[in-house]
Regions:
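Hydrophobic "anchor" residues on beta-strands that sit immediately upstream
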Residues: 28-31, 111, 148
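Hydrophobic residues at beta-strand termini and immediately following loops
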Residues: 60, 151, 210
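ATP-dependent small-molecule kinase phosphotransfer cores
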Residues: 51-143
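NTP-dependent small-molecule kinase module
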Residues: 2-19, 47, 163-254
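Walker A (P-loop) phosphate-binding motif
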Residues: 21-47
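Conserved nucleotide-binding/hydrolysis micro-motifs of P-loop NTPases
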Residues: 64-66, 118-119, 153-159, 215-216
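A glycine- and Lys/Arg-enriched "phosphate-lid" helix/loop adjacent to the NTP-binding pocket
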Residues: 121-196
Length: 254
């Protein structure tokens, strides 16, 4: 019988056995935060440190699927995305990367660092007026990171860091939903909504909050400490369905 036809119960058992066993396993670590929060800088420093310590590290970035990204880019260029379409396409991009990059790397015991994960979609889409439960369903079966670092900054800090060197684009500034013509003014209004959603998500999903206003070195050393503590956490039972579905669809004989 082909792997894709294996009973879901059997695939769930394989997932539990693979990720719940003894020894070093793959870890998924997400870096989240509003634009200008400093998360990308910290993600790069953290990856360099992990590799120097002997870890095999894979990085995945938001909106980077070779299959879906060109579609999103073309639709953004002509400003033809409704909030619902924006959400659906980014969820499709996310799912493609989970199936082709994230889960294969985790299965092979690598550390996956995600520069933005599903929480970016939740925060931005709800800030655009969509229902949280509706958006969550787009990302099912849900795959939860082992660690989520949320880099908290104020709307003023985010706006200052982003707009000092460039002008936010149409969707980045939220002009599709704010009805504010000035991109800088629109960005400030929109990022307030995004940060408000992030703060709620950080509580609900038990993210680890990092003060993005602190010096870069202080933040980095804090991440090291948290990683040493968090890497010993047991594998989350929540992820069984996501892994089982991937095993069924991929048919890779793992």
């Amino acid at each position: 019988m082909p792997q894709s036809a294996a009973p879901l119960r059997q695939l769930r058992h394989r997932a539990r056995r693979h990720f719940g066993g003894a020894g070093r396993r793959g870890l998924l670590i997400a870096f989240e935060g509003a634009d200008g929060s400093g998360k990308t800088t910290q993600r790069k420093l953290f990856k360099t440190w992990l590799k120097a310590d002997g870890y095999d590290v894979v990085t995945t970035k938001w909106n980077s699927s070779d299959l879906i990204k060109p579609i999103i880019k073309s639709r953004k260029t002509v400003q033809a995305l409704s909030p619902e379409e924006f959400s659906l396409l980014h969820a499709a991009d996310f799912r493609h990367r989970v199936e082709h990059t994230v889960l294969p790397a985790l299965w092979d015991g690598q550390i996956v660092i995600a520069d933005r994960f599903l929480f970016t979609g939740l925060a931005r889409d709800v800030a655009r007026g969509l229902d949280l439960d509706w958006v969550l369903k787009l990302y099912q079966p849900l795959l939860w990171p082992d660690l989520v670092f949320y880099f908290a900054v104020t709307p003023d800090t985010s706006s200052r860091r982003v707009t000092t060197t460039r002008t936010p684009n149409f969707y980045e500034s939220g002009r599709d939903v704010t009805d504010i013509a000035d991109p800088v003014e629109s960005y400030y209004t929109f990022v307030q909504r995004v940060i408000r959603e992030y703060e709620s998500l950080a509580i609900v999903f038990n993210m680890t909050t990092i003060d993005g206003e602190l010096p870069i070195a202080d933040q980095h050393h804090r991440l090291r400490e948290l990683f040493r503590e968090g890497q010993t956490r047991p594998w989350s039972e929540w992820n069984v369905d996501a892994v089982a579905e991937w095993l069924a669809v991929s048919g890779n004989g793992r």
